[in-house]
Amino acid sequence: MKRFLNHRLLYVLLSSLIACTIQAIKLEDSPFSFGQKYRGEKFLIAGCGWDKVAVIDKRTCRFEWVHTIGKGEDCNDVEVTREQNILYAYTAGARLITPGQHVVWDYKVGGNEELFTATQLFDGGYLLAICGHPARIVELDNNGRTIKEIHFETGIETVHNQFRQIEKTRRNTYLIPLFGSGELIEMNVSG
């Protein structure tokens, strides 16, 4: 019965996170001291309206690691990087932190912009996508310095309704899901 309740608790917690991002963590070479006993049974979670980024043990439903984000910093994208750091997007920026909670870099956006995409690229750099007028795709090097910035218009007036989770393909194009129009567009690096 207790096991059922733990799984029920995990289900309720995960389903209550609106726009929740969940990533199963690969534990090989992980700095998280969760051991190899439950290989692949940890989840990195975050969600809009929740003030944390956390690692949860699937079996016990216990928090193994928690990072509290600031008031109003809704997290919409989170991942463990190849270097085993935590990268997450929050409405006013993106942040890369170590498992020890040290901030490696913190990229902030302007007052009329919102950032909902932060992901590590194939080459080890980072991709950030910023809703605004104009919207921007920003690529950072592995130290968090801007190396490329592309400006474009989405045709969607309300900044919050523009897009989420942009992806860069191996063909050097960007896939952009436009919320306001229901379209998926592909854009090259020239914009």
Please tell me what each predicted stretch does.
Residues 1-2, 144:
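Accessible peptide chain termini
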Residues 2-11:
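Bacterial N-terminal signal peptides that target proteins for export
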Residues 11-19:
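Bacterial N-terminal signal peptides
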Residues 25-191:
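Secretory-pathway ectodomains
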